[in-house]
């Protein structure tokens, strides 16, 4: 069993076999828990502070499972980590697959559960090297084991396999991704066209407000807030890269959450191309925030085994929980710094970047004054006036 990872087994009130997996980063004061019911895809039932008794995740399944609603489907909507129509999901499609132009509606059955995750080696250091950061903490450059779970699920009839990864990183950042594989060869059917895979994190009932950013040149990252109502809100980016309107984070939290207060949950798609961030709530269940890569028709087509590229990896979807936006941001900063140990292993001068905010006469005394303060001047800071 991986460190800071626990597994529990039990049964639901209706006798369904349950398996719970609990991931925690005590130093970061965060934990995440999920429950498997039978061979169904898991559901995230906890994301927040560490639990005093992690085995209560089993009881959370019955506590959170929606009751059957009169006049509705036999199973009330309760999204798994990858909701499909097979589990009564009636929101926006999050899994879009086709063969020969015909839509597939897979029902995934879990075939394997493996605990453990791996944080890849850092970008600017040799594997196995260690260092001490500016706070005096000992760090390793990886790869390193982290709390995580890997779930493999299949629809044998449709010829589709999904491998889903969830990891909890040292700074408290959660991340998930999925790999979709075509199991059918050319003799068994057409190639598998992939239209969308959108992952997500569930929200508690208390999360009733959304924060994103919008903007344009000279007014980038302008915050905008709105209630999380029944329906779907999304921020697509189709410029081939994040543009001035891009919302690097989509955050949902208790109404009025700020920088230092209020439980809030953020997601970020780790992708430089077309992508979408979304928040969605149905009448029968709590909200979901998530996102993924935006694909055009025919952009990703998977061949059969041994016939070419037969799998597709989604970008990482990062999730950050915190009491206020500062704690959320700190988890992202911790992760970014861990990727560049040499850059952050010693003190750095302040970077003063006034750019278009100030025009100075080209006098050396300005540069000399900033040099004495340890600042680094960005090119273009001192301009003729």
Can you describe what each PLM-predicted range is?
Residues 297-303, 310-315, 336-338, 343, ...:
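Glycine-enriched loop-and-adjacent helix/strand subsegments that border the catalytic/binding cleft
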Residues 27, 103-110, 120-121, 302-322:
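Short Pro-Gly-centered flexible turn/kink motifs
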Residues 27, 31, 178, 309, ...:
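Conserved, mostly hydrophobic/aromatic
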Residues 2-22, 287-306:
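Short acidic, Pro/Gly- and aromatic-enriched capping/linker segments at domain boundaries
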Residues 11, 325, 359-363:
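Acidic-and-aromatic substrate-binding clefts and catalytic sites of carbohydrate-active enzymes
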Residues 30, 316, 320-349, 356:
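Terminal connector regions
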Residues 4-11, 18-21, 30-32, 41-285:
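Polysaccharide-binding surfaces and accessory modules of carbohydrate-active proteins
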Residues 343-385:
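Aromatic-lined carbohydrate-binding/catalytic grooves of carbohydrate-active enzymes
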